[in-house]
Design a protein with these regions (language model features):
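A charged, aromatic-enriched C-terminal amphipathic alpha-helix characteristic of glycosyltransferases
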Residues: 16, 327-330, 337-371
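N-terminal subdomain of nucleotide-sugar transferases
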Residues: 1-44, 83
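Conserved donor-binding/catalytic core segment of Leloir-type glycosyltransferases
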Residues: 186-204, 210-213, 228
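Membrane-proximal helix-turn-helix segments that form the acceptor-binding/catalytic region
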Residues: 26, 74, 98, 102-109, ...
Length: 372
């Protein structure tokens, strides 16, 4: 059986979203499905729609290319028909409009089953500013119409229906072969190293931890806590939330901004770390229940971690510290006391999530829509 994994943007091997997409494609292949990946590429300004390493459609450069890549989907439909594709896995880019609706309608007419993944839901609150709200408005006008054309909506949330369509609930998965297990347990008698890895958005709430460190160091403690932030700031808002606190409270020796890291550099930082920091402010974007990929990656590394949302895969795990979903500073003393009680090894933490492999998660979708 043949499938097409369809996304509406480009790929960057160092980017977390791109890694996730590759994991999902490989998982579908591991389930016995001949899966091709359709994505956009822009070498030298030219807009290309790709199928794996082959060019499907060349839209050219300039304004024309920018428009065509957003409205020309007939080449995808024709490819799916020609190649006898029977299943389309489409990753939403919040781009419901007459063109995507027509594309899915044509696929369904050809007998192709189409599901759409919504990576984060709800997502309206993520659109801040007039220009971004304009883009969202188009999606809001057409997303229920698009949803009616689908065989299902894949979600990592606990929502049973989205846009009036039944959901296929899965968890963000893990490709264990791609994530290195932490090899050593560090001496934490005098210091504790925390790590947060993300493209830094306001909903990660890293500012809550930095505020907690400011409060903690105001008492001149002997026990030292360090926070390693690994990733680039998404925008000025995130910089303004974090950088002034570091400067005002003279935390430069305790909060390190590493920028984006991957590969062996990232592995070394995880070896130095003792505990990880998940999202601490998903409530800022209106989300209470979510199954983030980052939580799973931390567990696969073998680290205990903290977060503030509800993640049903981790709620009762002994290596999880839940903090309130509010704007309070993180209590560093409580975090230290929690860590001191930890007894599980990195391997034991990793083994606790074996059921969250990407192959298991993607197989749920296959079974749900009865692909054969």
């Amino acid at each position: 059986m043949k499938a097409l994994f369809l996304i509406f943007h480009g790929l960057n091997p160092a980017n977390g979203i791109s890694k996730k997409i590759y994991y999902q494609v490989n998982a579908l292949r591991a389930c016995g499905i001949d899966t091709r990946l359709c994505y956009l590429n822009e070498p030298n300004g030219r807009k290309l729609r790709m199928i794996d390493s082959e060019v499907l459609q060349d839209y050219g450069a300039g304004f024309k290319g920018k428009i065509l890549k957003r409205i020309e989907y007939s080449s995808i439909v024709e490819y799916a028909k020609k190649e006898n594709i029977s299943f389309i896995y489409m990753r939403s880019d919040h781009n419901a409009n007459p063109f995507t609706i027509h594309m899915v309608h044509q696929m369904r007419k050809a007998g192709i089953k189409v599901v759409m993944e919504i990576p984060t839901y709800p997502y309206d609150q993520e659109y801040i500013g007039f220009s971004r709200r304009k883009l969202l408005f188009i999606d809001q006008c057409f997303r229920r119409v698009l949803a009616k054309q689908l065989c299902g909506i894949v979600t990592f949330s606990d929502y049973k229906t989205i846009f009036g369509v039944p959901t296929i609930q899965i968890s963000n998965g893990i490709d264990f072969s791609q994530i290195k297990l932490k090899q050593q347990v560090n001496d934490t008698n005098k210091k504790l190293h925390l790590i947060g890895v993300a493209e830094i958005h306001y909903w990660h709430g890293f500012d809550r931890l930095v505020k907690g460190l400011a409060d903690y160091y105001d008492s001149h403690p002997n026990y030292k806590v360090f926070f390693h932030i690994v990733g680039d700031f998404f925008g000025q808002r995130e910089k303004d939330d974090i950088l002034p606190i570091i400067k005002q409270h003279k935390l430069e020796n305790y909060v390190t901004l590493h920028g984006a890291k991957h590969g062996e550099e990232l592995d070394r930082l995880f070896e130095k770390a003792d505990m990880a920091i998940g999202s601490l402010a998903r409530h800022r974007s209106g989300i209470t229940h979510i199954k983030t990929l980052k939580n799973r990656e931390y567990a696969a590394r073998g680290l205990s971690f903290i977060y503030s949302e509800t993640d049903s895969d981790f709620e009762n795990k002994p290596y999880i510290l839940k903090v309130p979903a509010d704007e309070t500073a993180i209590d560093i003393n409580s975090l230290i006391h929690f860590y001191e009680k930890q007894s599980l090894s990195p391997l034991e933490i990793r083994e606790s999530i074996r059921s969250l492999s990407w192959e298991t998660q993607m197989n749920k979708i296959i079974n749900s829509i009865k692909i054969s």
